[in-house]
């Protein structure tokens, strides 16, 4: 929890309580359904929660923003972002049903009414969104066709509506393969933990 309050200093009591509840909830569910690797569960706040919140350092979602989280797994980055932005609407999808079960159970325990989670492939999602977020799902070039037509035009943020990828390592080849303009935001510019030295938020747009 100290990691979260180190970088996000204006959280409400309710937000603080929600973030504090994540560790016991995920440990309990992970014992039943392996949604987070066993070696990472003790570093939940560093490797999953704070990592997810790096997106908030790139774009500060305005009230009413609609966000789609593709391949959410156990709820990352969607659940931490939904706690941080209670007045935004989040749709979380994953092709593995048991993971979505965990997401729904945790969102319900936290009372997060701004999350809807579905056992669904990205291609089958209906509606349009201001931003699409995703973490460690697939290469950019493969991902883009899945979400074609799912972005609302332009928007009201400094960054135009687009896709925010949580990525790691050298992305030069992946970016070239995508044939898209991709903007890179090193997470080490926002968080000083060693874990983030090679981590980035990659941003691009697709019509």
Language model features: what each stretch is:
Residues 155-170:
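Conserved beta-strand signature within the Rossmann-like core of class I S-adenosyl-L-methionine
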Residues 140-151:
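A short, conserved alpha-helix within the catalytic core of class I
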Residues 30, 106-107, 151:
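Conserved hydrophobic residues forming the short capping helix/wall of the S-adenosyl-L-methionine
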Residues 1-38:
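N-terminal auxiliary segments of SAM/dcSAM-dependent transferases
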Residues 168-207:
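Active-site capping/gating segments
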Residues 53-134, 144:
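Conserved SAM/SAH cofactor-binding pocket of Class I
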Residues 28, 32, 45-63:
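Conserved alpha-helix/loop element of class I SAM-dependent methyltransferases that forms part
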């Amino acid at each position: 929890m100290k990691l979260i309050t180190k970088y996000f200093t204006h959280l409400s009591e309710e937000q603080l309580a929600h973030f504090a509840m994540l560790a016991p909830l995920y440990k309990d569910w992970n014992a039943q359904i392996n949604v987070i690797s066993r070696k990472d569960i003790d570093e939940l706040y560093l490797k999953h929660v704070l990592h997810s919140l790096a997106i908030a350092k790139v774009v500060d979602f305005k009230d009413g923003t609609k966000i789609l989280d593709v391949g959410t797994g156990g709820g990352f980055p969607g659940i931490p972002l939904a706690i941080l932005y209670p007045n935004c609407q989040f749709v979380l999808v994953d092709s593995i049903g048991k993971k979505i079960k965990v997401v729904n159970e945790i969102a319900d325990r936290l009372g997060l009414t701004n999350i809807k989670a579905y056992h669904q492939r990205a291609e089958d999602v209906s509606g349009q969104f201001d931003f699409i977020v995703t973490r460690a799902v697939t290469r950019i070039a493969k991902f883009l066709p899945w979400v074609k037509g799912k972005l609302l035009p332009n928007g009201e943020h400094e960054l135009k509506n687009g896709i925010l990828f949580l990525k790691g390592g050298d992305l030069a080849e992946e970016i070239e393969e995508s044939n898209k303009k991709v903007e890179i935001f090193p997470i080490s510019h926002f968080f000083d933990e060693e874990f983030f030295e090679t981590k980035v938020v990659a941003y691009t747009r697709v019509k």
